[in-house]
């Protein structure tokens, strides 16, 4: 689906040609079947003994056969053309794959917080806008890389606007890992170890440094030793206790080189597993370094909330939802923004609560008709009415609503 979207925007000529070919081939195949059926019908209804004497029949069969061969040749040529079109389409597969990867980064975010839910329809529209806003280039390879980079940065910035501050680095790390996994840079077992720890029981064994290394850390080092890339780690640790203790005692263990050649043996991602084992407090710093190296500085500092950018993402059918934290009230900021947009006299708000649904629906209908902005506050206080609000939004027909209409919603986090 995303490949079709990318090609439709980047090479509409290919899209049109392929659609035309499909229709043409379908007609040709149907015509071929009709000719074959006609030839069989003529042969079945002709006396075999008079077959060679029926000049009209022979002429008809000859013409039908020639037409059939011509159609078959056209089909062969069409199939070759279709293969060439598909080859050209495949050049954009990398963009579509990145688009798919990005969507699956957010498909399970609701497990982190139920408020983090994103529809496929929203994402496809967003991805299309990213394509439209990517700087043009005459060189195809440059253009494709630009599409991948622009969509990734815009995706990160857009999603970060909808996340609580405490979840932003986690999301950047998830995005980084998904990209690395897609390019074969992360082993699945190593990823599981980093996220969940040892997956099977192993013998505890004697801790070589019980004075400063706790039993849990030693157990994880032994578990790491069972992974192919970490084979020999346990022995190295035992033989180089003093060097490893320097790492353990450092204020930020992620900034030091691991002893006994392990710094060279391991990738930056794999080093996080060692940090998890005996300096878990340094993992966030190590994650930040990985993100910086793999994705770039724009993924380290999450963008500050920008009401103007959020407004640009909205439409008559796409309301904006402010998820509130304790003490936060976006109403004043929105009022200032309305003034900046010369909408002060076209902006109204109301607080939802028991029995307010009918009034809110009426105000919404008026705002849609007049092209006003309506802010419905405290949606969490009208949970029973929200399904009706959802239906009202889904029923909005863009062509029948004033294009200046916007709906703003506020709610406390709710499961």
What are these regions (language model features)?
Residues 1-414:
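Amphipathic alpha-helical coiled-coil
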